[in-house]
Curated annotation (Swiss-Prot):
<dbReference type="InterPro" id="IPR020471">
    <property type="entry name" value="AKR"/>
</dbReference>
<keyword id="KW-0521">NADP</keyword>
<dbReference type="GO" id="GO:0005829">
    <property type="term" value="C:cytosol"/>
</dbReference>
<feature type="active site" description="Proton donor">
    <location>
        <position position="57"/>
    </location>
</feature>
<dbReference type="InterPro" id="IPR036812">
    <property type="entry name" value="NADP_OxRdtase_dom_sf"/>
</dbReference>
<comment type="similarity">
    <text>Belongs to the aldo/keto reductase family.</text>
</comment>
<protein>
    <recommendedName>
        <fullName>Probable NAD(P)H-dependent oxidoreductase 2</fullName>
        <ecNumber>1.-.-.-</ecNumber>
    </recommendedName>
</protein>
<keyword id="KW-0560">Oxidoreductase</keyword>
<keyword id="KW-0520">NAD</keyword>
<dbReference type="InterPro" id="IPR018170">
    <property type="entry name" value="Aldo/ket_reductase_CS"/>
</dbReference>
<comment type="function">
    <text>May play a role in auxin-induced cell growth by generating hydroxyl radicals, which tends to increase cell wall loosening.</text>
</comment>
<feature type="site" description="Lowers pKa of active site Tyr">
    <location>
        <position position="87"/>
    </location>
</feature>
<dbReference type="InterPro" id="IPR023210">
    <property type="entry name" value="NADP_OxRdtase_dom"/>
</dbReference>
<dbReference type="InterPro" id="IPR044497">
    <property type="entry name" value="AKR4A/B"/>
</dbReference>
<dbReference type="GO" id="GO:0004032">
    <property type="term" value="F:aldose reductase (NADPH) activity"/>
</dbReference>
<dbReference type="Pfam" id="PF00248">
    <property type="entry name" value="Aldo_ket_red"/>
</dbReference>
<feature type="binding site">
    <location>
        <begin position="216"/>
        <end position="275"/>
    </location>
    <ligand>
        <name>NADP(+)</name>
    </ligand>
</feature>
Amino acid sequence: MAMATIPEVPASALLPTMPRIGMGTAAFPFTSSEETTAALLRAIELGYRHFDTARLYATEGCVSEAVAEAVRRGLVASRADVFVTSKLWCSDLHAGRVVPAARETLRNLGMDYVDLLLVHWPATVAPGSYDFPFPKEEMAPAFDMEGVWRGMEECHRLGLARAIGVSNFSAKKLEQLLSFAVVRPAANQVEMNPMWQQRTLREVCRREGVQLCGYSPLGAKGTPWGSAAVMDSGVLHDIAQTKGKTLAQICLRWMYEQGDVLLVKTYNENRMKENLDIFDWELTEEERDKISKLPQQRGLTGMQFVCDNGPYKCVEDLWDGA
């Protein structure tokens, strides 16, 4: 397979040009490994130019090594040819911790800046811990959204992050953030797939010019937070069979047609290639209609963030009922 060219989200005042498919690096239990670094390097060889990491995942060093090796091999001319997203974990989401935590992420990455820096969850836990799950007694009673965002804006002002955004924010929380943000969030990264289409959130993001980025596009089957609902869907299976595509490709193409950025996660080379083979065909109106009628169910509930001593007493509080 020749190196693929991945379409990009056009640059805007909020966001640098962003490849529409990114390679995720979260593997549970969270750990760095030579296997991860090798897979990321192979992904670069195949044409991937967008990599999604986080302090929690323990893979910032893997991204650093893969990008540095890709430059040494001439696969990319420089770090600037790669789009890197990272996220600040809840233990660093204290007003005075954001900038130091961003600098630590950059040290881990061996980079002067990230293209996109995200607030990982709208929640705060005791500083110094990067465990998940975490002891629920470490949950702070409130999430200082404005204080944290001012720190994110400072990261942007200092050039530590070319763009800033959020992850796992409901439509209501995103609107709350937009009400006071000086530097607006460029992106919101959330669970997204045909069985959890995020219709309400998508509407808000489109209206406000916030790029929607979707993780678990295939439902994350086999992980503690995923389900088999997507991969076991008879409707998606039938569409795939009719088109001569895989079920995974149907899911990814559907998200691509919605205008989303897709975050895929596989270290299998054949599936890496398959994930890039979605750009020269499209779903029919009838197929899109069938997908729109699929029953909806959230995979990642966020129950870890629900506790009596925190801001979210039930799952509905975390997601604001949406």
